[in-house]
C-alpha cells in the first residue's frame, strides 16, 4: 500500500510540474490565442485534473510492476500526452517541444532496450516505419478537403514512432 501512495504522490507532484509547464507553453503561444481561451488553464479545476489524472495512472503503472526504465518511460509518456491533449484542447496548438521530447524518449528507449547494433537498427526501422505510416494515414484526409491540423498530423506521426509497426 505504501508503494501505491508513493506512486500517487509522485503523480500529483509531476502533474503539478507539468501543469505549470503547460501554463508556460500556453503563455508563449498567447499570440495565437485571440479569444483568450488559454486563460481557462488558471481555473482550479484544470490544476486539479492535471494532478489527479497522472496520480491515478501512476498507480495503474505500479499495479503492472514494470521494470524501472519502463516505469519511468510510461510516466513521462503520460505526462507529455496530458500536456499535449490539454494544450490542444485549450488553444488548439500542439507544442513541438513536447513532440520532440516524445521522439527523444522513444530513441532513448530503443538505445536502452536494444542489445546490439542489429537489434537497434531493426527496432529503429520498425519505429520509423510506424512514423511514416501514421503520417501518411493522417495526411490522406487533407487530399479530400477534410481539415486535420498540422499539429495533429505531427502528433500522430510521433505516436506511430513510439508504437512502431507492431503497435498497430
Predicted regions and their residues:
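A membrane-topology feature that recognizes alpha-helical transmembrane segments
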Residues: 1-168
Amino acid at each position: 500500500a505504501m508503494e501505491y501512495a508513493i506512486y500517487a504522490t509522485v503523480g500529483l507532484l509531476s502533474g503539478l510540474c507539468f501543469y505549470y509547464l503547460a501554463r508556460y507553453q500556453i503563455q508563449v503561444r498567447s499570440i495565437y490565442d485571440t479569444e483568450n481561451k488559454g486563460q481557462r488553464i488558471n481555473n482550479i479545476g484544470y490544476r486539479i485534473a492535471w494532478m489527479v489524472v497522472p496520480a491515478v495512472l501512476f498507480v495503474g503503472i505500479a499495479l503492472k510492476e514494470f521494470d524501472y526504465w519502463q516505469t519511468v518511460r510510461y510516466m513521462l509518456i503520460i505526462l507529455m500526452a496530458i500536456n499535449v491533449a490539454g494544450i490542444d484542447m485549450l488553444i488548439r496548438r500542439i507544442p513541438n517541444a513536447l513532440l520532440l521530447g516524445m521522439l527523444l524518449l522513444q530513441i532513448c528507449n530503443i538505445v536502452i532496450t536494444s542489445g546490439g547494433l542489429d537489434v537497434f537498427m531493426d527496432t529503429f526501422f520498425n519505429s520509423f516505419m510506424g512514423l511514416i505510416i501514421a503520417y501518411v494515414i493522417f495526411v490522406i484526409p487533407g487530399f479530400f478537403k477534410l481539415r486535420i491540423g498540422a499539429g495533429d498530423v505531427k502528433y500522430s506521426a510521433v505516436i506511430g514512432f513510439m508504437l512502431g509497426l507492431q503497435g498497430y
